[in-house]
Amino acid sequence: MTGSFPQSRCRRNRLYPTIRQALMETVITPSNLVLPLFVVPGESVEEPVSSMPGVQRWSVDRLGKPVEEAMEAGVRCFLLFGIPSYKDPDGTSADRLDQPVQRALRLLRDRYPEAYLVGDVCLCEYTSHGHCGIIKEGNIDNDLTLKRLASVALSHAEAGAHAVAPSDMMDGRVSVIRQELDGSGFSDVGVWSYAAKFASAFYGPFRDAAESTPAFGDRRSHQLPVENRLEAIRDALMDQDEG
């Protein structure tokens, strides 16, 4: 009978390495990977992150070293996180063009035209309290924070980012950022939504690297509960609809 054993034998497509490779549904190569880079003020800085062995913070003038090593290995995409020269309650340094991420974007865009550059958009690295938004009466003001995030995203686009990646988990961030970029002539700049970002203890080492640990409280009011699968899917679909 056609379609049944013994005429149909699925193992025919598994017998030889060449055919197995040709029929792979999922192929992961260095070109599929994104390298995070933590950028700091100053010069000649190569500072190890103690909680993440092998990871360093770099000043802008030293970024060529990790970027060139990665590109030689086939990695072409880089996600930039910034540690600013100063912090305040509203994270006002986040959209300044003289800060590490914006400077790094300009340098890398000019020096490595084949690289794809993404700027992380959040306020936690830039606020003195370490939270992802502007605090009013003890809570994050979602809509006020959106205005700051849109300004940060625009500053990254102006500095040369191919895409921006809002990691704050505020409601409506993708829509507001998309509108800001499109209205400013950057419709080709992508928005990489973190979508399903959970309130997880696994972020501990990253917060050390980005110097973004909250000074009080936690981020459970905006990051997803780890128990809620359907909520994560809903958030991801909403981000997709927002652009």
Residue ranges and their predicted role:
Residues 6-12:
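Exposed beta-strand/loop interface patches that mediate assembly or binding
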Residues 2-5, 16, 22, 28-35, ...:
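Alpha/beta enzyme core
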